[in-house]
Amino acid sequence: MESLGTVTILGHGCQWIDLNPCARYIIAMSLRLIRIIIVLMGALLVAGGAYTVYWYNAAAELRAGIDRWAQDRRAAGWTVDLGDPDITGFPTRLEAFFQTPQISGPDSWWRWVAPNIRATAAPWLPGEIAVSAPGVHVVTRRSGDVWAELDKAEADIVIENAAMKNIVARLAGVRIRLPGGEMLVAESAVMRLLGSVPATPSIDVGAYTPHPDPSDMGFGVALDVRKIVLPDQWRPVLGRNIGKIALDAVIVGEIAPAASLKHTLTRWRDGGGTVEVAALALYWDVLRLRTSGTFALDGKLQPEGAMVADIRGIEAAMDRLLAAGVINSRAAFAARIISRALSFGGGSARLPLSVQEQRLFIGPAPVLRIKPIRWN
């Protein structure tokens, strides 16, 4: 005999078990679970709606920031054509796409025509931006056009307090055509620009690095370029192939943009500007150089400075320079004597180098006249 909610168990006697409490418990737990699910779904809908509003506000602020930057540059005399950037990437990123932007400096003394540029940031970290711009970049100056074809062009930019704090650029497959038609090629290049930093090394090139004054602060520049091929038209004495150029330096002194590069450098020099080279490495055929030192500009805006260098292969390099007529026999002889006197067991030599009045000195001996730099 059965009835709703009861079970009859047959045995030595009849027992009646009422299942109504179990059913009520199961129903109560099911309702509680349904309520939890409804609350969670409501919370997710509210959070999703709030995040959607946040993302679109961030996208609007990004577009407004781009417009403000362009307007500020135009007010300073620049010509800026960014087109109508596309802002996409919802929901996981903010992505700005610029189609072939063009920018010209004041008085049109330079002009940059870029390929398509894509900039991406996480909505919750808008100050950390990843930029990609492979393709052909054209920089036009009064001396002519420079074409740079880049198989890979990426950069990571960190912005803090409306100012650029850190930029790391990575290039690969670099082919540069200069105004005279010369081709300069590099397998890869990495460049880092830092904001206010002390004049201390951030890369190790194996060179002796003096301890700088802790008060020396400036604009940090680090560069590492590999497998460079120089233009044949230059007829480089040590060969066209450079294995490596690595630089870690701090530019000390205020750099205030002026009407031209020459005027900008003049202001920087007059304000006591210097370049503290914490580390420099050059691997060029037979020559291996690792050095550090301090440089500035003289009254004619030509480099001058002093450094201590570890050099390997200086005698072979002097022989090539002598054979090419770049230096005379007296300078080559002086370089050999100084190198042998200061070398370590016939290996590398630690030599004092200086640049003054467009001449390179090894110790007190002038060995090479340097062509003047035309900043205009």
What do the PLM-derived regions correspond to, one by one?
Residues 75-208, 280:
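N-terminal beta-strand/beta-hairpin edge segment
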Residues 183-282:
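Acidic, serine/threonine- and glycine-rich low-complexity intrinsically disordered segments
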Residues 102-110, 137-148, 173-188, 227-240, ...:
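Flexible, membrane-facing loop/turn or short amphipathic-helix motifs
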Residues 30-67:
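N-terminal type II signal-anchor transmembrane helix
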Residues 25-41, 83, 264-270, 274, ...:
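Extended terminal
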